[in-house]
């Protein structure tokens, strides 16, 4: 406990690479990277994006995150297949894949039970009550979903626009009372494409 780790944005689609990911990696304890998905419901494109992501990693951390929150196709099964294809490439290359999105977007666009059946405890879910500065979680909007590893509880955890997240699964516990006793946080900058950094304080 007491460590300061990071999850850093590296790529988006197959045409954008963060110009600051290497610098952010060198000045932090990076435990993961994430990719903003543009593949919708296309398996081949998802695989290409995963390979592009992996080929541009500044280091080899534990987690690789598929940020799936925009551009889903109208075919829920196709979207699910594409997400799994992306995660499969990450897994095949020795990483632990994580799925990031919002609960309503997830339920509307993918069969999340298929994702968690293959990759248990792999969800990073965003849900917050407003856009006010909230340094502490408001449990009234906790997105109750099985297999949630991280919960993003605000987009403005600090003035200046930083996300904050609670690590739900990290010590083998998944009960609210125990979560609050071992509260760990992720902070992710949202100041444009160049500023995406996640910081986890505590056990992951």
Predicted regions: what is each one?
Residues 15, 158-162, 196:
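Short, solvent-exposed loop/turn elements at domain surfaces
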Residues 1-99:
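Substrate-binding cleft of extracellular glycoside hydrolase catalytic domains
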Residues 104-115:
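Beta-rich nucleic-acid/ligand-interaction surfaces
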Residues 1-4, 114-183:
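Functionally critical loop-and-helix segments that line ligand-binding/catalytic clefts
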Residues 36, 100-102, 128, 153:
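Conserved beta-strand termini and adjacent loop/short-helix elements that scaffold enzyme active sites
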Residues 179-204:
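Short, surface-exposed polybasic-aromatic patches that bind anionic ligands, especially phosphate groups
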């Amino acid at each position: 406990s007491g460590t300061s780790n990071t999850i850093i944005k590296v790529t988006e689609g197959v045409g954008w690479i963060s110009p600051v990911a290497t610098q952010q990696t060198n000045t932090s304890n990076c435990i993961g990277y994430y990719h903003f998905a543009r593949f919708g419901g296309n398996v081949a494109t998802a695989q290409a994006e995963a390979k592009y992501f992996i080929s541009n990693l500044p280091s080899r951390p534990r987690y690789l995150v598929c940020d799936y929150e925009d551009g889903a196709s109208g075919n829920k099964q196709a979207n699910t297949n594409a997400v799994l294809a992306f995660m499969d490439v990450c897994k095949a290359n020795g990483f632990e894949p994580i799925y990031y999105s919002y609960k309503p977007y997830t339920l509307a666009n993918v069969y999340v039970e298929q994702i968690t059946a293959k990759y248990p405890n792999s969800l990073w879910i965003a849900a917050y009550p407003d856009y006010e500065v909230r340094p502490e979680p408001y449990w009234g909007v906790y997105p109750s979903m099985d297999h949630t590893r991280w919960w993003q509880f605000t987009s403005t955890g600090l003035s200046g626009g930083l996300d904050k997240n609670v690590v739900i699964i990290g010590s083998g516990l998944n009960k609210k009372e125990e979560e609050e006793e071992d509260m760990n946080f992720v902070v992710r900058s949202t100041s444009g494409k160049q500023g995406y950094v996640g910081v986890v304080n505590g056990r992951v």
